[in-house]
């Protein structure tokens, strides 16, 4: 999966040669928290330390605290985000914000190579490397109140911008 996006230069456009990554579901998501900047500032070092400790990232990053068997990986590939939610790795209300609710009904994990399973198993729940990142931000200014309300955003709100994808498993597929 990859793509080039070109926009009309007469309209101030640009060419983006890598607007979409080549691992499945590579992309950027915005997590809107219930916290405000005032809530966060006194605890920012504590938050940064926790993120470094709890979110494995970088080349070769793996989860050591969570491991899935091949059978479980096949179930994840078939049932999608719902499988993870049922086991406490997410919130039911979040599934409705994922494309196709995080599941493709026609997915067939039997078509996935052994190499993809080997690469993917230790990487589930990791951020990755390269241009993947996790960035804690806050809403500094709201320019369109109606749009902000629709997205559940408000001035001073802490958000987390996450760029990740399916890593080795998705790359192999």
Predicted regions and their residues:
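A conserved active-site cap/scaffold subdomain adjacent to cofactor or substrate pockets
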Residues: 155-173
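Glycine-rich, flexible loop motifs
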Residues: 3, 7-10, 14-19, 24-149, ...
């Amino acid at each position: 999966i990859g793509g080039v996006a070109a926009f009309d230069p007469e309209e101030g456009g640009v060419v983006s040669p890598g607007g979409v990554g080549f691992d499945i579901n590579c992309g950027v998501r915005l997590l809107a928290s219930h916290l405000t900047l005032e809530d966060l500032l006194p605890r920012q070092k504590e938050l940064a330390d926790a993120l470094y400790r709890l979110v494995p990232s970088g080349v070769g990053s793996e989860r050591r605290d969570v491991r899935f068997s091949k059978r479980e990986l096949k179930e994840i590939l078939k049932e999608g985000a719902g499988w993870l939610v049922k086991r406490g790795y997410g919130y039911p209300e979040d599934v409705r914000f994922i494309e196709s609710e995080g599941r493709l009904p026609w997915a067939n994990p039997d078509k996935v190579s052994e190499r993809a399973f080997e690469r993917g198993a230790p990487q589930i729940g990791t951020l990755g490397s390269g241009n993947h990142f996790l960035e804690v931000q806050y809403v500094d200014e709201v320019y369109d109140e109606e749009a902000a309300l629709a997205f559940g955003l408000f001035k001073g709100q802490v958000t987390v911008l996450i760029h990740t994808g399916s890593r080795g498993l998705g790359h192999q597929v």
